[in-house]
């Protein structure tokens, strides 16, 4: 039985068996190809830096074409050995190349005499002679009552813009506007502290819009709205009494009616012809009495106002 099994095994594996040995030493890996180093002749040539623009400039070049408008300092466009900065260890101040101090301050390289002359020549066609009739400030204020104030700023920085430059101030005297007594009082009530009673000047300042032109249009719009609103009369304004008035008005008041009735009775007793209402209001005694009463009501009582009121009553009643 064992001999038969051995013969069968030999028939299945006819060749001799070879035992494989195990080793702890790893076989060396195949060498990898490293990066190929190009030779100096095969390397691309670096592009040389171009010389500064200032070295190519001619001495008789057109400078307004180089610096046409206001702009930060450009070292490559200014052929001047400009230096600025604090010298380190008593050395030479910093040159213009890469100097941030020159960028902080404003420059006027665009305002050369030649550039200013060209600007004046270009604007000359749009300029007219000053009107001969406007030979005084009073006439200018009469024909041009609205005054517009704006401001331009020069900032120390790379930007030539300033947010404060967009503010616009409009000034106008209320006496130059076509306003009656009611419209003037209502406009003063609407504007509040923007009106100066001592100078009779209304001041409107606008700075909400990002552009100066927009703020100018907004200021003119506000003035237009205030003017038209002041002329409107609401229903509740007609029902106001003397106690509701912000300022005492003598016309059509109880004081005026009392004075007229008293004077009419006195004149009727003296003569048979009674004067008219307009004649009594036009006399000097009634006008002085009116001024004293208005001053006493609006400004309050004091020794001077009471003394003036006393004298006006004496003259009105022929007691002086």
UniProtKB/Swiss-Prot annotation:
InterPro entries: Ribosomal_mS35_mit (IPR019349), Ribosomal_mS35_mt (IPR039848). GO terms for biological process: mitochondrial translation. Its main location: mitochondrion. The keyword Zinc-finger does not apply. Signal peptide: none annotated. Residues 24-63 are annotated as: Disordered. GO terms for molecular function: structural constituent of ribosome. Keywords: Mitochondrion, Ribonucleoprotein, Ribosomal protein, Transit peptide. Disulfide bonds: none annotated. The keyword Nuclease does not apply. Pfam families: MRP-S28. It is found in: Mitochondrion. One of its GO terms (cellular component) is mitochondrial inner membrane. Belongs to the mitochondrion-specific ribosomal protein mS35 family. Component of the mitochondrial ribosome small subunit (28S) which comprises a 12S rRNA and about 30 distinct proteins. This is Small ribosomal subunit protein mS35.
